[in-house]
Amino acid sequence: MSAQPEDPGVSVVRLAPGPVTPDDVRTAARWLADGVGRHPDAAFDAQAGPVRWSCWATAEHVVDDLLAYALQVAGLPLLDYLPLAGPKGEDEIAHVKREAGAAGMAEVLLAGGELLAAQVGARPDTARAYHPYGLSDPQGFAAMGIVEILVHGRDILEGLTGIAPDLPEGLSARVLARLFPDLPDRTGDLPAAQVLVWATGRCELPGLARRTRWRWDATVR
């Protein structure tokens, strides 16, 4: 990804991005589903960019997060995640049949995005649910789901193609505003898509080293 904005006015989008919406979740899920659905099934055994998982395992992780966030918004637990576990007692409750291939994974990603979007849209702004990075509202869970889709989607597509794709600018701007309130001032002149990649520890920016530790802030502000 280029270190310089292609459009000198693009940073304005991040300065006044507007709220995160259920349709943003759907748009993000469609972006990733379209990206993974066009690749051969065997390609998903490759490592997903900088993470240690395969592309398939990383996509499953995204699905699992979408399901977990939808369940949090549905159940509104205040002290912990809902007490669910996978068939072997693991934390991950979502597993996609490997024989379903890329097309099946794309369908599940779309379904996970729709499930989270529907739950976010059904709850009032005053609803709250637990997340380890702060008690959050429906918009916060929507933003967290989008970050998982975009950032891990970038990992997956880099693993599948060897090239890290550009992230959607508007979506990146809105989730940065919601989840990363303490960004350095110098990031204000850069495209939000680049800043989101930096904020999640995946690149350097001019004058800013790559982050080795990071977390978002899910609390309501």
Where are the language model's segments positioned?
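Structured surface interface patches that mediate subunit assembly and partner/cofactor docking
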Residues: 2-24, 31, 38-51, 68-91, ...
